[in-house]
Amino acid sequence: MKCPFCNSADTRVKNSRHSDDNMSVRRRRLCEVCNSRFTTLEELLLKPIMVLKKDGRMEPFDKQKLLTSIMLATNKRPVTHAQINMVLSKILYKFESVKEDVIPARVIGEIVKNNLLVLDKVAYIRFVSVYMDFSDADDFCSLVEKIKEGSDK
């Protein structure tokens, strides 16, 4: 690993830590030439996944788009960044275990939905209201009743 300060290749790892979800490794490094310290983050490279949209279009899977939708659903909720990252990692791990290279958007939505239901019910309702394209208050009331009954189907 080259030093970002002096471009020397003479660096060594001082400390390594696995993330909570074991999907990445954070390494603290020291440059032997200029004595600068810097941190690197090693993450699992996902296989290329295509998303099949409702209208039949295909687009490459965008991890940032998924993270943004989860962040919007959990906005101003008592959910930490660590919890959000854990949910994201679970979802990405699930994608890695799928044999297909094309995943329907519907399947992605269901996986996110199920993870948010466990994490925070309000975030779940927010996500589902967009995902299911709710049109009026009755849709919300119906979903809340299903959650109270313990069934989200």
From Swiss-Prot:
Record keywords: ATP-binding, DNA-binding, Metal-binding, Nucleotide-binding, Repressor, Transcription, Transcription regulation, Zinc, Zinc-finger
Cofactor(s) recorded in Swiss-Prot or TrEMBL: Zn(2+)
Zn-finger (unnamed) residues: 3-34
Zinc-finger found in the keyword field: yes
PROSITE patterns (alphabetical): ATP_CONE
Region (Disordered): 1-20
Record note on cofactor: Binds 1 zinc ion.
Record-annotated membrane-spanning stretches: none
Any matching Pfam family: ATP-cone
Any Gene Ontology biological process: negative regulation of DNA-templated transcription
The organism's place on the tree of life at top rank: Bacteria
Keyword DNA repair: no
Alphabetized GO MF terms: ATP binding; DNA binding; zinc ion binding
Basic and acidic residues compositional bias, start-end: 11-20
Chain ranges of the ATP-cone domain: 49-139
HAMAP family named in the record: NrdR (MF_00440)
Similarity comment: family membership: Belongs to the NrdR family.
Role summary: Negatively regulates transcription of bacterial ribonucleotide reductase nrd genes and operons by binding to NrdR-boxes.
Name of protein: Transcriptional repressor NrdR
Species, as recorded: Anaplasma phagocytophilum (strain HZ)
Gene that encodes the chain: nrdR
